[in-house]
Each structure stands twice: as structure tokens, then as C-alpha cells.
A protein has these predicted regions:
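Short amphipathic alpha-helix that is part of the acyltransferase structural core
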Residues: 1-32, 42-44, 146-156
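Conserved acetyl-CoA-binding loop-helix of GNAT-fold acetyltransferases
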Residues: 70, 76-89
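Conserved active-site alpha-helix within GNAT-family acetyltransferase domains
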Residues: 101-128
């Protein structure tokens, strides 16, 4: 972890950022679909992308905060919070997030609250079901604790 905090810039992603975003998302084994740079904000230190997050724009109009990722060296410095605040500042509609149950409390400060999956829009419900099923199967195969997912909603 970085203890001295050099300047971190949060900005909208540009096309040249896409390879770094894809690499970070793959490294963390996050949902690899719908990774369009136009939906992303990035955290930059010097010329290095050290964090990224996006709001997915689904065809039905629903919005999903996702792909929140920070490089290991920079974790614990508040970068993910700054990325989320940056993205949510530009959103005037309902936003959902799919997260592990044990991480849900981190989203309360932005007004996210748990909802039953049946109340989520179809694309978000589908992402939730796929992620929860794959995560459960992988945990069982690897003989580790199952970390269940949940859906949170933020209303404006």
C-alpha cells in the first residue's frame, strides 16, 4: 500500500485507457462483459492507471455500477470511493450494484440499500444470477467458503 499520497486524478476514460482497464478487470476476475471505455472513470497517478470503475448502461435503460478495481499497491487509499463518487455525481437515475454480501455496507454512504433479486431489472438480475452461480460453483470446486452476492439499489 502507498503511504504517501501522490496526486491522483479521477477522470473519464479515453480510448487509449481500454487495454489497461481490460487487464485490471481480468486480473481481478470481474465480469468481463460490457467493458466500454466510455462508461468508465479511471484513477491516474502520473501516467499510470491505478483504478477504474464504470456504470453500465443496459438496453432497458437500467444502470449498474460495476468493475470497481484498484491495483493492489493503491488499495486502502480511498481511490474506489473517489471513483464511485465521480461516477454517481453524473447519474440522475436509479443505479444498481451487485456485490458480495460482506461488502454491501461499503455502499450505504451513497444511499445503496439491498433489494430482492426479483425487484431488479432483468439485465441486472441476469448478471446477479450468473455471477452468484459461477461464484458458488467455483467455491465448491476449490473447497473454499461460498461468498454470496446481493443486489443493492440507489434511488435519486
Amino acid at each position: 500500500m502507498i503511504t504517501a499520497h501522490p496526486a491522483i486524478t479521477i477522470r473519464r476514460a479515453v480510448a487509449d485507457d481500454e487495454p489497461a482497464i481490460h487487464a485490471m478487470v481480468r486480473r481481478e476476475r470481474l465480469n468481463p462483459h460490457h467493458l466500454y471505455f466510455r462508461n468508465f472513470a479511471v484513477a491516474v497517478s502520473g501516467h499510470e492507471i491505478v483504478g477504474a470503475s464504470q456504470i453500465r448502461h443496459h438496453r432497458d435503460g437500467s444502470r449498474e455500477l460495476g468493475s470497481v478495481v484498484v491495483t493492489p499497491l493503491w488499495r486502502g487509499c480511498g481511490i474506489s470511493a473517489r471513483l464511485i463518487e465521480f461516477l454517481l455525481a453524473g447519474e440522475g437515475s436509479v443505479v444498481h450494484v451487485i456485490t458480495r454480501k460482506r461488502h454491501a455496507h461499503h455502499y450505504e454512504r451513497w444511499g445503496f440499500a439491498p433489494i430482492p433479486a426479483r425487484l431488479a431489472p432483468c439485465p441486472i438480475r441476469l448478471n446477479f444470477r450468473i455471477g452468484d452461480t459461477i461464484g458458488t460453483i467455483m467455491a465448491l470446486v476449490q473447497r473454499r467458503r461460498v461468498n454470496r452476492l446481493m443486489i443493492l439499489r440507489r434511488t435519486v
